[in-house]
Amino acid sequence: MDIKRSNQGAGQLVGETAESGQQRYPGRFSRRDFEAIAERAVLREPGQEPGREGAARAEALGMALDAGVRVDGRRLWDSLMELAKIGATPKGGVCRLALTDLDKAARDLIIDWGQQAGCSITIDQMGNVFMRRGGRNDALAPVLTGSHTDSQPTGGRFDGIYGVLGGLEVIRTLNDHGIETERPIEVVIWTNEEGCRFAPGMTASGVFAGVFALDYALGLHDMDGKTLGEELRRIGYAGETPCRRRPIHAAFELHIEQGPILEAEGLTIGVVTDAQGQRWYEIEMIGQEAHAGPTPMPRRRDALLGASRIVQLVNEIGLRHAPLACATVGMMRVYPNSRNVIPGRVFFTVDFRHPQDEILARMNDELREGIARVTAEIGLEAKIDQIFYYAPVAFDRACAQAVRSAASRLGYGHREIVSGAGHDACYLAQVAPTSMVFVPCVDGMSHNEIEDALPEWIEAGANVLLHAVVDRASEPG
């Protein structure tokens, strides 16, 4: 599905007067300023080889950026706050579950903004939205950035959406300054990153990377039995473009850290070098429903008792492999859920994370051994389904260096960091050179309505993204 809207003045640089092409922006450079910088950079010495011109253009862009090109922090913040109204919750967060009407409204608004910025829009079979700004050579593989619009049921204003709007701000800023990159730049909205409505998460980026089959992903269903494919069609985001890997020159995802390290150390930028591996499980403990009064304690086959012991075991496993391990039981459903009936069945989830795959495997073994022991002691049955796994990710070193160099040039305090959360970038890294940019969030809080970030952090991360994206988008073929 391709969406194209004709805009008045198409082809004219944003902010440029038709008469002169020289309009200045407050505190910014005019187009003529940049042309002068570029002219100095591309002047050839006698006998200079022809292939040097593309490299010289890249150098010119670097000089221009170093000379003072920065994102409009106020515009980015205002865009974030406008999106936060869609699905706003009483405590200041958002509830914008994947492929609901609220998710559609967020996508619609961002697409409108993308078209106003001169982007062409493509939607693929998984509902992924690609907003493309052309380059000097559109045949070259693009530089990709973006994230997701869906949220947790009690999510925050920055998770995911910051990466999408930060990418859009990069395009707006390049338009403001009349900067043309050698390669196209694309901003993507990935479908169903969170996985709280349709599990597992990171679904559409997984299809793009070849991790999940298209039919499998479209057939995922929510608690009401609605499938992901049905909901894509309902909200008008079932595109026709194939969802599959294609050449990507480099990819960056801008995100809040979702942890406390950067804020605690007084740093502004996290250069993400790696991401933890994850295993998700759905577990069912099956016992025997019985009357809570007449049934003697020794004769009970209490499924909730067994599940409770496994919850404790999960916590012990996490502590055993601390400080790098994380182990969480996040969902539980008890049947028949009556106050005077001994539970006969309990469903719950387990989330294991660790940056070393061998430790993840050990945690898996300890969980299964513990479940076998508990079920034997209480007389229960257990069903264990590992629904999601990806190995720890090592991000591309050249992309990480682009982030590091940008942070250094801009004067932001930074450090290398490992992502504790899963992101679409983790799957994208399997098919394209990829890295991430982190900024702090207040008290390390995320997946919570009180998730917050300071405007100066938000602006800084977008500036680093701008420089990193332009660095890679300036590379010739």
What residues fall within each predicted segment?
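A non-catalytic alpha/beta surface segment that caps or lines the substrate-entry region
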Residues: 88-134
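A short beta-alpha structural unit
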Residues: 98-99, 328-337, 349-355, 381-400, ...
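Midchain, well-structured core segments that form catalytic/ion-binding scaffolds
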Residues: 192-193, 197-358
